[in-house]
Amino acid sequence: LTLTTGGGGASFSSTINSQASQARALTIANTDGAVSVSGAIGTGTNGALGALIIGTAEAAGNTGNITLAAIGTDSAAGAASITVGNSRTGTLTLGGVEYFSTGAQTWESDDFNLTGADITIQTTDSNVTFQDGAAGQIVLSDTADLTIDTGSGAGNISIAPTIAGTTGGANRSEDITLDAGTGNIELLNTGAAVIATDIGDVTLTGTTISLYDNITTT
């Protein structure tokens, strides 16, 4: 199924599931309109999607913001793969807790807001990639920890933006756990710390870990 939006964007207030056990693919092709999904994706009984693709076209006007609630649960994937955003996407907001696919995940935007409490992004031995279109950051909400887990196999973790916490509020530093199993971790930001701003514990697990700049903790 492919949905194409224009300047008006698209908003989904309910859950989105595949026909049971059919793993139907879903593409939402937004231009300058925002896309918002406030219900969970792929959490119905045998309702996981196939490929989930949202706003990936690299068109000049494709700048709409994207907001997503959960994809899957902590024990069941909500999609076979996840590809969201492009280099011109304004802000990509992940407001849920679980983002689980069996296959690879690619997230791209000028800025990322992770507003859910203790977000977990996980795959089954497949890559997780965060790309930024400009000088964006992945900003965690106050007291919200981030875990990215690609399973015990060779799923790589590659992150171009800085991962940053939020000062103020309850003012508990945010913890970061990146576990690539037997895969590799690359934190690619240059010119500023790869992880910084009100960050507590940082745990990195992988065969090879490449840091292109500093890590700063509180």
Q: For the regions a protein language model found, what residue spans apply to each?
A:
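Extracellular lectin-like interaction modules
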Residues: 1-218
